[in-house]
Amino acid sequence: IIFSVNENKVIKKFNFYKKKYKKFSKKLNIIIENNVVYISDNIGYLYAYDVEKEKIIWAKNLKVPFRSNFKIFKNKLIAANQNNELFFFDKINGNTINSIPTEETVIKNKFENNLSIDENNLFFLNTYGSLYSINNNSMKINWFLNLNQTTDLNPSNLFLSNQIVNNNEKIIISSNNYLYILDVKNGSLIFKKNISTQIKPIIIEEDKLLFISKTNLLILMNLDNGEFIYSIDINQKIADYLNLRKKNAYLKDMMILNNNLFIFLNNSFIIKFNLNGKIEKVKKLPSKINTYPILVNNRILYIDFKNKISYID
């Protein structure tokens, strides 16, 4: 489905899949560049769709489900499959340029392979808990390290993490046990905090990290020395603002827009904080949020539980 934000309507629809996949629950990983939509899925297909010409440019069946986000570097599409194998594809024709096998995990959890990129390197965190730095041009491994605290891989202690964050100098890994700050050049540990986070952290002003702990503390941390600038109880802040009894808020996502922090709750409310940690506004969304929100032309878009697109200006 191609949705026009300006026209506020669906302008194009396209179905790649044959009837035999009609009842199969599909999970699509999507990235867009120059009116071409690149898609990988949990069946094993990888394909490119030209939005203007309304046609498939190419399609490949790798036969192993993809299980990562997408990245683009120059002529390369980069993705990983459920076996933790990293692939570099030619975005012109979909052919495989290179692949790098990494450690597999037989038991799967909700964590998916994660990719982050800067101008020189790709960072690949797999479900085993290993972090790889790979040169974007040569596709060779610079270094790798394992962040998993155990080799006993059972359902109770599988590695979990939020998405990788980097700022060209530091890599931030927020796992189920620790918050790691690593050196981009060699992967050495700068420092780590005994804090588990529930949402992807955000880097602000290049040297500060904003994140939410699993106990709903909103924390702003100095990335250079690891000191906390503030630590705020979100539950208490909401209770004080609304003059209600303190309850546990269930959080879905957060984003920065116009120098304000927006925190999305599972119960369809959105909390607007300034970057000093003060609540500016509490607003009910027009419908209950189903997908993770995205930002398009200063509008926040999401899909609700009726599969309708909603937006907030």
Sequence positions of predicted segments:
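WD40 beta-propeller blade core
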Residues: I1, Y47, F87, Y132, ...
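Short loop/turn segments that connect beta-strands within beta-propeller blades
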Residues: V5-N8, D50-E54, D90-G94, N135-M139, ...
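Extracytoplasmic beta-rich repeat domains
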Residues: K9-N34, K55-K74, T96-E119, K140-N168, ...
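Beta-propeller domains
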Residues: T127, I172-I190, T197-Q198, E206
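Blade-level signature of beta-propeller repeat domains, shared across WD40, Kelch, NHL, RCC1
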Residues: S287-D313
